[in-house]
């Protein structure tokens, strides 16, 4: 089993989790192929994490399975936008941490 972590990505964890749930349990090669056709910005980061985890273990993409793909919330950057009458509203810029684990599929013995 090998893993890769990408930290402090300027992407909302809620949006990234939608993509992470799609690839969990998939073959790594199939997951990378399906992520390349997704229009979401988070798909690029998750594909990068999967290919990095495969390379960290010295595997080929077709021989491993995405065991887990977890997206955790990172720190939130807070900015202010000036509003009417001298007030201000808060702009939240969330960040994410992506953790991907890949491993060889467990053989099913009858």
UniProtKB/Swiss-Prot annotation:
Entry keywords, A to Z: Ribonucleoprotein, Ribosomal protein, RNA-binding, rRNA-binding
Molecular function terms from GO: rRNA binding; structural constituent of ribosome
GO process annotations (BP): translation
PROSITE patterns according to UniProt: RIBOSOMAL_L22
Pfam name, any one: Ribosomal_L22
Alphabetical list of Gene3D superfamilies matching this protein: Ribosomal protein L22/L17
GO CC terms, sorted: cytosolic large ribosomal subunit
Purpose: This protein binds specifically to 23S rRNA; its binding is stimulated by other ribosomal proteins, e.g. L4, L17, and L20. It is important during the early stages of 50S assembly. It makes multiple contacts with different domains of the 23S rRNA in the assembled 50S subunit and ribosome. The globular domain of the protein is located near the polypeptide exit tunnel on the outside of the subunit, while an extended beta-hairpin is found that lines the wall of the exit tunnel in the center of the 70S ribosome.
Subunit comment: Part of the 50S ribosomal subunit.
Record-stated family: Belongs to the universal ribosomal protein uL22 family.
Protein name stated in the entry: Large ribosomal subunit protein uL22
Lineage of the species this protein comes from: Bacteria, Pseudomonadati, Campylobacterota, Epsilonproteobacteria, Campylobacterales
